Amino acid sequence: MFTVFLLVVLATTVVSFTSGRSTFRGRNAAAKASGLVSLTDRRPQCCSHPACNVDHPEICR
């Protein structure tokens, strides 16, 4: 009985760990996309500021 309990705990841990990682990747990608959209909205301010222009050359082309 104890062995079955340990197997259930292990299976639950593995499933929650792997699903948590994929969810984190999705949120991270969404956060990056959201950040790029907000930078694109501020294009004139960013492109005229040298430090921002160097950090984000993809929006100042």
Swiss-Prot record:
Keywords: Acetylcholine receptor inhibiting toxin, Disulfide bond, G-protein coupled receptor impairing toxin, Hydroxylation, Neurotoxin, Postsynaptic neurotoxin, Secreted, Signal, Toxin. Residues 1-20 form the signal peptide. The modification 4-hydroxyproline is found at residues 44, 50. GO terms for cellular component: extracellular region; host cell postsynaptic membrane. The keyword Cell membrane does not apply. The keyword rRNA processing does not apply. InterPro entries: Conotoxin_a-typ, Conotoxin_a-typ_CS. It is found in: Secreted. Residues 21-42 form a propeptide. Residues 48-50 are annotated as: Ser-Xaa-Pro motif, crucial for potent interaction with nAChR. Its main location: secreted. Expressed by the venom duct. Pfam families: Toxin_8. One of its GO terms (molecular function) is toxin activity. Alpha-conotoxins act on postsynaptic membranes, they bind to the nicotinic acetylcholine receptors (nAChR) and thus inhibit them. This toxin also inhibits high voltage-activated (HVA) calcium channel currents in rat DRG neurons (8% inhibition at 1 uM toxin) probably by activating GABA(B) receptors (GABBR1 and/or GABBR2). The cysteine framework is I (CC-C-C). Alpha4/7 pattern. Belongs to the conotoxin A superfamily. This is Alpha-conotoxin-like Tx1.2.
